């Protein structure tokens, strides 16, 4: 727990998804905000009571990832009162269902940049480079202990600590951001390119326990479409991941189609086969019309990875009518 001797100066952090339905993973934006406040010696806490009194918080940063999440009572209660001004809200949960392309573009751009333009944050020192004041979201080291109190509460309720390993055992970040697929159901639907984002060392945690073992021995990567980036991007980054000798996983899945579409597809499969991959390899299969290229890619993949577990995120029904026969090859 952070230094909270001056309660009137505490900054509150809210993971709206956690307070509503619960969530398997920590909120990376909040981890980075917590790291920024930790760097500056500013007291903060993760608010775990959806009906908490907000009076002793000077500012509250609320993040919501999913559109189905119900915002917490403490925020709803603040509407139309002076307390509402304390809240800074963001996340895809506030705009992902926006149907107007222009409005979606405006909201996403505003959301992606708002913390780096935050007046209060820009009064605080930046200790990770890029600029002298204000948070750099790509460079900021996450504070990986933000959810410790939540985990301890759940353990007291009878849950096993291992249930919350995604909060405890992983360094988390994006090596790249962006995509080129323009899938209409994805938050990256308006993106046109994939660019480097964070360097691995900016979020790779080296904390060790009393026995000298890494507290967070695994790496979670949340890149949108890593393999579709330019070879000058993905190749050195994948090499760097392999050289850490730490198990890693691309949590949002990898684009299987690139193995067949890219002239470097076999190199991708070979490099991944040499990695200490964490768990099964997960690929995206979002559109049934891609089944031919997926099958071609799988043949390449299995040539280099004949025994490794391979799974797909399968998006059922996209651009399919109710009468369409899925999983059936089209007539010649």
Where in this protein do the model-derived segments appear?
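Conserved small/polar residues in nucleotide/adenosyl-binding loops
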Residues: 327-332
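Catalytic core of nucleotide-activated saccharide and alditol-phosphate transferases
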Residues: 82-179, 184-187
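A short, structured N-terminal alpha-helical element that caps or precedes a catalytic domain
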Residues: 1-89, 93-98, 109-111
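Catalytic cores of alpha/beta
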Residues: 322-326
């Amino acid at each position: 727990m952070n230094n909270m001797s001056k309660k009137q100066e505490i900054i509150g952090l809210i993971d709206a998804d956690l307070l509503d339905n619960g969530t398997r993973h920590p909120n990376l934006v909040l981890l980075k905000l917590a790291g920024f406040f930790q760097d500056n010696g500013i007291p903060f806490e993760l608010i775990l009571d959806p009906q908490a009194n907000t009076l002793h918080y000077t500012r509250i940063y609320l993040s919501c990832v999913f559109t189905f999440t119900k915002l917490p009572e403490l925020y709803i209660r603040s509407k139309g009162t002076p307390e509402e001004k304390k809240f800074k809200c963001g996340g895809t949960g506030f705009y992902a269902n926006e149907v107007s392309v222009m409005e979606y573009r405006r909201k996403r751009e505003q959301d992606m940049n708002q913390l780096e333009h935050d007046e209060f944050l820009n009064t605080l020192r930046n200790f990770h480079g890029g600029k002298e004041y204000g948070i750099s979201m790509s460079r900021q080291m996450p504070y990986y202990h933000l959810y410790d109190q939540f985990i301890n509460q759940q353990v007291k309720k009878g849950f096993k600590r291992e249930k919350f390993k995604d909060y405890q055992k992983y360094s988390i970040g994006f090596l790249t951001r962006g995509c080129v697929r323009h899938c209409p159901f994805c938050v990256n639907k308006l993106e046109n390119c994939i660019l480097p984002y964070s360097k691995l060392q900016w979020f790779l945690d080296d904390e060790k326990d009393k026995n000298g073992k890494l507290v967070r021995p695994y790496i979670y990567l949340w890149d949108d479409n890593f393999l579709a980036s330019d070879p000058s991007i993905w190749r050195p980054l994948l090499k760097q991941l392999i050289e850490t000798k730490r198990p890693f996983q691309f949590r949002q899945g990898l684009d299987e189609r690139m193995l067949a579409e890219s002239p470097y597809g076999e190199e991708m499969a070979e490099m991944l086969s040499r990695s200490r991959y964490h768990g099964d390899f997960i690929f995206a299969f979002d559109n049934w019309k891609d089944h031919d290229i997926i099958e071609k890619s799988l043949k390449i993949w299995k040539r280099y990875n004949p025994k490794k577990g391979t799974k797909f995120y399968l998006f059922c029904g996209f651009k399919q009518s109710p009468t369409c026969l899925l999983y059936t090859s089209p007539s010649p």
